[in-house]
Amino acid sequence: KMYWGDLHNHCNITYGHGDMRDAFEAAKGQLDFVSVTPHAMWPDIPGADDPRLKWVIDYHTGAFKRLREGGYEKYVKMTNEYNKEGEFLTFVGYEAHSMEHGDHVALNYDLDAPLVECTSIEDWKQKAKGHKVFITPHHMGYQGGYRGYNWKCFTEGDITPFVEMYSRHGLAESDQGDYPYLHDMGPRQWEGTIQYGLELG
């Protein structure tokens, strides 16, 4: 049997659009599983010395603060509320940005999974060892060093069993194919594709 789901959906609990309950309701009406995914951290956020970027930093860090001041507990509670074994599965997850490693999403098997603080994506993966969690790269095709995926840091195994090729950002698997990236982080690049990663071994 084939199952359909969305492992990386956003809402306005941090920065995104739409109410969290609406996100779960929409998913429940058409999917078998979902993770509504708050943005949780950006350990290497740039621009602290550039006053032009203060609004960007405040936008992100303000959302992270809201998540830690009750938002995460509300999110976990609603994720559990919508989880119906055998009917509709929900997963607790969250996203971390990284200039060096690229953005990643955590998907937890544990419906009461805590928000794990980290200093980098690699630190996050180390802290996740021994837990039932996937940490997978997101929008891989952006420029390396600016939140595009860094294949040199790929760790194959239980923690990263898959990578994301398509998202709202567009198609990551080609720098010339359909669905170009829509965000302001630049065009796609070949070095973010799965084929490039496979060629590295």
Please state what every model-predicted region is:
Residues 1-201:
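Extended, charged catalytic domains and RNA/DNA-binding interfaces, predominantly
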